[in-house]
Amino acid sequence: MALETLQIEHVPSDHHVYAALFRDVQNVDFLQAQLIGKNPEFEYAFIDASVIISRTHLFAAIFRALNTLTEGTLQTPNVHSDIVIGLSPTNNISESYRRYGLTPSKTRDVLVIKIVYPKLSSENSTITSEQQPTPESIWQHLTTHIQGTPVPLTNEELAKSTDWAKVRKYYKLNGVPGVERIDKADEEGRRKEMEGLVISGIALRGL
């Protein structure tokens, strides 16, 4: 099973984060339609993997969204869409969806994030763990509905998807002193340098 349980520090113990990476997804239009239609069975963060440079980059957006969830300050209808907009260095929500979410005919590789946490039922009582989705049920749902190849969520696999031109454009790194001097032949070195710049952009959003 390629669904990974992510360990993120300073997250409440009853909040669980699951993630998977699918390559060459053939039904991005279907997945986007479920999001637009607000299908509750598809309450995930679907992210275009081409704009992600590392696990740390992804973790930064997840951590920010979990903070807004626990503080009751979500900017969007749910924590999953807050993860998507949390990748952006700007406060433009619609632009964030376009750039970091799914785009039929353009998105090939898809990152999926699922947050499972205690919710209140209509009777204002906490949903029990038996009623919450399990890693197994999440994985079964994803593999049933995503027409793509699951691969491990590693920096090496993410590097195969990263579109550096997009990253530089979206995070306004073109022309930034030092960026042009990054050795493009040193993939690991470039990832580390760019990672710091990108995460700084995310952290400074809204300040």
Curated annotation (Swiss-Prot):
GO biological process: tRNA threonylcarbamoyladenosine modification
Gene3D superfamilies recorded: CGI121/TPRKB
GO cellular component, one term: nucleus
Heme in keyword set: no
Keywords recorded for this protein, A-Z: Activator, Chromosome, Nucleus, Telomere, Transcription, Transcription regulation, tRNA processing
Predominant localisation class: nucleus
Superkingdom of origin: Eukaryota
Cellular compartments annotated: Nucleus; Chromosome, Telomere
InterPro entries: CGI121/TPRKB, CGI121/TPRKB_sf
Keyword Transcription: yes
Complex formation: Component of the EKC/KEOPS complex composed of at least bud32, cgi121, gon7, kae1 and pcc1; the whole complex dimerizes.
Role this protein plays: Component of the EKC/KEOPS complex that is required for the formation of a threonylcarbamoyl group on adenosine at position 37 (t(6)A37) in tRNAs that read codons beginning with adenine. The complex is probably involved in the transfer of the threonylcarbamoyl moiety of threonylcarbamoyl-AMP (TC-AMP) to the N6 group of A37. Cgi121 acts as an allosteric effector that regulates the t(6)A activity of the complex. The EKC/KEOPS complex also promotes both telomere uncapping and telomere elongation. The complex is required for efficient recruitment of transcriptional coactivators.
Family membership: Belongs to the CGI121/TPRKB family.
Protein name as it appears in the record: EKC/KEOPS complex subunit cgi121
Organism placement in taxonomy: Eukaryota, Fungi, Dikarya, Ascomycota, Pezizomycotina
